[in-house]
Amino acid sequence: MRIIKRLALGAAVVGLSALTPPAVASATPGSGVGAVTIFDHVVGGTRYVLKEITIAPGGSTGWHYHPGPVKGVVTKGELTHHESDCSVDGVYRPGQFITESSGTGYVHIGRNLATTPLVLTVLYENPAGDPLAVSTPNPGCAFE
């Protein structure tokens, strides 16, 4: 009987945890973003991931930073890139390259303010085991 009570209690805790918001509820999730992984391989403690990322018109990456450097090229559409002080630090069009520094000091957001989909090819160079991006709260900007 004690085993049944413990199992019931465990099931209740698991069920309730599904209703509890995550600890990073103040983070700003992306919207309208899709990605296809082209390559994902670890070499010497560094994880290299190549992705094709599509952001729908009006979509964004959400506020975030990267544990490792990121390099990308716009293949279609237009990327508007903002720093954590809300300023636009670049508008990128097809054929233009973007590089993003790593770490908590480089919180940023990428937005598609155009009327057509934005497509980027992006290479992440991360420490193996780290996420590609870490979501953060909006730093106080009037958007997202």
Each language-model region and where it sits:
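A short, N-terminal "cap"/entry segment at the start of jelly-roll beta-barrel domains
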Residues: 2-52, 90-91, 98-99, 131-144
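Short beta-strand/loop turn elements enriched in aromatics
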Residues: 40-42, 60-68
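Short acidic-glycine-tyrosine-enriched beta hairpin
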Residues: 43-47, 55-57, 79, 83-105
